[in-house]
C-alpha cells in the first residue's frame, strides 16, 4: 500500500487532537499493488502466482480447489470492464485462463465470495449478471465451459450452501417478488428448482453444515423479526423467538402501517416504493419526506423489518408527514439495465425518478407537492444535496447525512465504477457533483456529518459548506458530530440517534408547512 496516499482522520478527545492516517485511494489516484503468493510449508518458500505485471488492477478473490492443487484467482481491470478467472498451479504458480467476463458499455459487477467449487471440484459455481439478471452458472474446471443453472427476469441474491452428495444448491432470490427474499434449492444441472421458505417477506437464512436444518430470521415491513428453525425441505417449522415483547410494546403506540406502491420509471422499467401516513391526521394534504438511498449496492423499499429505520420512519410519520421510500433506477434487484443506466452520469436518473414519484404520490396519496423533502445517508445524502443544488427548486428541502459532494473525494473503486476514471470522464465528475451548483441553490438544506467519518470524509460536507458560502448563500443549516464515524453509531448509538432525528424533525417542522 505504499503507493496509496494517506488521508488524515482527526479526533478531538485529547488536548492535542489525534491524527490517524488512513490509506485511502481517491478516484484517479494510485491503487495498492497487490501480488499473490503461495507459501510452501514443507520447503518454507513463497511461490509467486503469475497474475500479470500490471499494477493497475484489482485482485477480487482467491479460492483453493478441494484437492489443494489449484488456486483460483480473480482479477479485475482498473476500469472494471473486464474480470478474469485464472487457474494457478499450486507448485509452480503458473496460471492459465479459465473464464472471463467483459462489459464494454459499463462495468462488470463483482460478487464477494464468488466461485464456489462444487461436484468434487469439477466445476465452479459462479454468480453473474452477464445475461441481464444476476444468476447462477457452472464453470467447468477443466474446460471453462459455462452452463446456466438459473434463468429468468429475477435475481439470485446469495448462495447459502451446496450439497455435493445430493448435488443441490441452496440460494436466496427475489423470484417471488422483487421486494422479497426467499430461499430456494436447485440441482446442479438447473433442474428441480424448489422454493423452501413460505412466508411473504424477507428471509435471512443459515444452513447447518450437515445440510439438515435451516435457521430462518423472517420479517416483513409490518411484522417484527421471528426466528425459527426448519428442515431443509421447509417442513417441521419450530419458532424459537417470536419477539413477543416487542410486539406487545408496539400495541401501546400508534404505529401506522407501511403500504407498498409501484411506479413506472419509463416504458419498460418500474420502481418499488412504500409509504407511511400519520396514524391520525385530518389534513387534506400532507408534506412528504422522500427517504431514498439510491446507490447501486442496496435496495431499501423491501418487505422487511429493520428496527432502526422501520420504527424511526413511523415515528417521523406521526410527526405529521407522509414518509415514502423508493428504489429508483440505479439500485439492484431488477436487472443490469435498471442498475447500470446511471453509468457515467449518476444523480440525473435518480432525481428524475424522485420527481416522478413526487408527482405520483401527490395524485394518489393526498400529498402537497410543494412541500417535499429528500433525506438519507451517504449516497442518499448525495442525492439530497444534488436535489437542492443542481435541481434547486424541484424540492422544498433536503437532509444530507454524510453526503458525497464531489466524486473525486470518494474512494476509487466506487467512484470509478459509477463514472469511469476522472481522466476519461472529467465532465461526468463535474456534472454529477453538488459543489459545482451552489450558485443555483435556493435554500432548505440541512447537512449532517461525523467528523471522524473514514468512509465519506468530512471534507465532502465542509467543501459543500464552503462553496455555498462562496456563492453568498446563508440559508442552509449544518451539524457535525465530533469524533463519530460514518454511521454515527459508535459509542452511544441510541443517544446519537435521538439527537439526530430530533434535529431532523425540528428542521422539517420549520421547512415543511
Model-identified regions with their sequence ranges:
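Serine-hydrolase catalytic core recognition
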Residues: 5-6, 68, 74, 204-513
Amino acid at each position: 500500500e505504499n503507493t496509496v496516499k494517506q488521508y488524515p482522520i482527526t479526533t478531538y478527545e485529547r488536548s492535542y487532537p489525534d491524527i490517524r492516517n488512513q490509506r485511502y485511494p481517491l478516484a484517479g489516484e494510485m491503487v495498492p499493488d497487490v501480488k499473490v503468493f503461495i507459501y510452501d510449508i514443507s520447503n518454507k518458500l513463497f511461490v509467486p502466482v503469475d497474475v500479470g505485471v500490471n499494477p493497475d488492477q484489482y485482485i477480487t478473490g482467491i479460492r483453493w480447489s478441494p484437492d489443494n492443487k489449484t488456486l483460483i484467482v480473480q482479477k479485475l481491470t482498473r476500469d472494471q470492464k473486464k474480470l478474469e478467472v485464472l487457474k494457478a498451479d499450486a507448485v509452480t504458480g503458473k496460471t492459465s485462463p479459465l473464464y472471463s467476463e467483459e462489459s464494454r458499455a459499463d462495468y462488470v459487477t463483482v460478487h464477494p465470495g464468488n466461485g464456489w467449487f462444487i461436484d468434487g471440484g469439477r466445476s465452479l459455481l459462479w454468480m453473474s449478471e452477464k445475461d441481464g439478471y444476476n444468476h447462477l452458472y457452472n464453470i467447468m474446471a477443466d474446460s471453462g465451459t459455462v452452463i446456466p443453472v438459473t434463468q429468468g427476469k429475477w435475481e439470485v441474491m446469495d448462495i447459502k450452501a451446496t450439497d455435493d452428495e445430493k448435488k443441490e444448491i441452496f440460494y436466496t432470490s427475489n423470484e417471488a417478488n422483487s421486494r422479497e427474499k426467499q430461499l430456494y434449492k436447485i440441482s446442479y444441472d438447473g433442474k428441480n428448482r424448489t422454493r423452501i421458505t413460505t412466508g411473504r417477506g424477507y428471509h435471512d437464512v443459515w444452513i447447518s453444515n450437515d445440510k439438515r436444518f435451516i435457521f430462518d430470521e423472517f420479517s416483513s415491513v409490518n411484522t417484527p423479526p421471528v426466528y425459527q428453525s426448519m428442515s431443509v425441505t421447509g417442513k417441521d417449522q419450530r419458532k424459537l423467538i417470536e419477539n413477543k415483547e416487542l410486539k406487545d410494546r408496539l400495541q401501546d403506540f400508534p404505529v401506522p402501517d407501511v403500504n407498498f406502491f409501484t411506479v413506472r420509471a419509463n416504458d419498460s422499467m418500474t420502481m418499488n416504493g412504500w409509504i407511511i401516513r400519520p396514524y391520525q391526521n385530518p389534513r387534506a394534504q400532507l408534506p412528504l419526506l422522500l427517504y431514498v438511498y439510491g446507490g447501486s449496492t442496496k435496495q431499501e423499499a423491501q418487505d422487511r423489518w429493520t428496527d432502526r429505520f422501520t420504527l424511526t420512519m413511523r415515528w417521523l410519520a406521526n410527526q405529521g408527514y407522509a414518509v415514502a421510500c423508493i428504489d429508483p433506477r440505479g439500485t439492484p434487484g431488477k436487472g443490469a439495465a435498471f442498475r447500470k443506466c446511471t453509468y457515467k452520469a449518476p444523480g440525473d436518473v435518480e432525481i428524475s425518478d424522485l420527481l416522478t414519484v413526487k408527482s405520483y404520490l401527490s395524485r394518489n396519496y393526498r400529498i402537497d407537492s410543494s412541500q417535499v423533502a429528500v433525506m438519507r445517508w451517504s449516497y442518499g445524502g448525495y442525492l439530497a444535496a444534488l436535489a437542492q443544488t443542481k435541481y434547486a427548486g424541484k424540492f422544498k428541502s433536503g437532509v444530507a447525512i454524510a453526503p458525497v459532494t464531489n466524486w473525486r473525494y470518494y474512494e476509487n473503486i466506487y467512484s470509478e465504477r459509477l463514472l469511469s476514471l476522472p481522466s476519461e470522464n472529467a465532465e461526468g465528475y463535474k456534472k454529477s457533483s453538488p459543489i459545482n451548483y451552489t450558485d443555483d441553490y435556493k435554500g432548505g438544506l440541512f447537512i449532517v456529518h461525523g467528523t471522524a467519518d473514514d468512509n465519506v470524509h468530512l471534507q465532502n460536507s465542509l467543501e459543500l459548506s464552503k462553496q455555498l458560502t462562496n456563492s453568498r448563500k446563508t440559508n442552509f443549516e449544518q451539524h457535525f458530530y465530533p469524533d463519530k464515524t460514518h454511521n454515527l453509531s459508535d459509542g452511544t448509538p441510541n443517544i446519537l440517534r435521538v439527537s439526530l432525528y430530533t434535529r431532523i424533525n425540528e428542521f422539517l417542522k420549520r421547512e415543511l408547512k
